[in-house]
Structure formats: C-alpha cells, structure tokens
Amino acid sequence: MGIITKIEQQKRNDDRVNIYVDDKFFIAIFKELVYTFNLKKGNEINEEELKPILDDEMYIKAKNKALNILSHADQSEKKLKEKLSSEFDENIIERVIDFLKSYNLVNDSVLAQKIVNTNVNLNKCGKNRIKQNLYNKGINRSTINEAVSELDKDTEFENAMYLAKKRYERVKKEDKKKIYQKISQHLSYKGFDYDIIKRVLNKLLNFDEYDI
C-alpha cells in the first residue's frame, strides 16, 4: 500500500492525528492507535495491517459515544445497543458493552433496582406499572421478575392508599359508585393489583364493591 511519510497532530483535536502515506493524506485516527500499533514514519503499511487499525478506530468512536450517552442517563444493555446500532457494527458494539460491563457502567440488575426504588418512593407506582416501566427501559423479563420480587406489600398498600386519598379529594362530591370507579381506575392505571385496590377502597370508603 505504501510507506508512512508523516504523522501529524491535528490542530483542532489533540486526540487525533493525520497519517500520510507516500506524501499524501491517507487517514485520520485517534492518537492512541499510533502507540497501540507502533506506527512510525518510514513504516510500510498494507491492507492486512490497516484492518485492525480501522476496527479499533471504530471501537474508540463507539466507546466514546456510549460514554456520552451514559453521562446523560443510565441505559440498559438493550437500549444502549439500539442507540449504537445505527452507526456501528455488532462486533464493535459487543466490544463496547464488554468494556462498559467490566467497569460496571452497564448493569441491568442495578439499573432495574434504581428504577424500582424511584417508582415506589417517588412515583408511588404499583407492581404492574413498575414491571411495564422496566420492560420499556429494555430490561429483560428475568431481571424484571427478580427486581420486583422483593417489593414490600405494606409499602405498596401505603402508596395505593396515598394515591386513593388524593383522588378522593377530587371526586368526593360525586355519588358512591362513581367515587369507587374513579379511584379504582386510577389505582389500576398506576399498576396496583385488584386485591390491593379492593383493600384500599374498603378501608378508605368503608364499603366494598358489593355495596354499590
């Protein structure tokens, strides 16, 4: 292919260099690859030697993009792969994921627990809504089931009661049947099971579904 005749630092990017072969611009790469592949002026470079350089160039680009994405918000493995797939090949993405996992920057179990805690403590969601939110974030079914398996039933009941009381203040002037229906629908939307909804309504309103 030719002889490397110059390796030039880019003026506007300290992390990148321009490689010239036979006195003509050949390629721009990350500076660290010069050391990784021991590239020097006077070295001959051929097609076989170029491929791993280009692969590592794409790997660094993909890794940098992934780190930038993660700097804004935690991502599941699935969602991060989806965001990288428009620009990078699968083998490059897998290398990036392996790197991120090695530093615990991508960990679906940890992410799932964070989402559960936020949904329970801040958003007052029930188990069904939490499971759907986890699925929407790209968490797999087994990790979802593990994350919600330790949900505290008393806390879930307290959250449902809190939401029911707030909704009751908005609908308390309506007739008994409508109050029951509207609170029930709201709690169902928030992801609570029928049994919890029934217990909440019975305690809050002193009647159950058979009274209406």
Swiss-Prot record:
A Gene Ontology biological process term: regulation of DNA repair
Transmembrane segments: none
Keywords: Cytoplasm
Gene Ontology CC: cytoplasm
Superkingdom: Bacteria
Pfam families in the record: RecX_HTH1 (PF21982), RecX_HTH2 (PF02631), RecX_HTH3 (PF21981)
Subcellular location: Cytoplasm
Record's keyword annotation contains Transcription: no
Role: Modulates RecA activity.
NCBIfam families linked: PRK00117.4-1
Similarity-based family: Belongs to the RecX family.
HAMAP family in UniProt: RecX
Protein name in the entry: Regulatory protein RecX
Organism: Clostridioides difficile (strain 630)
Gene field: recX
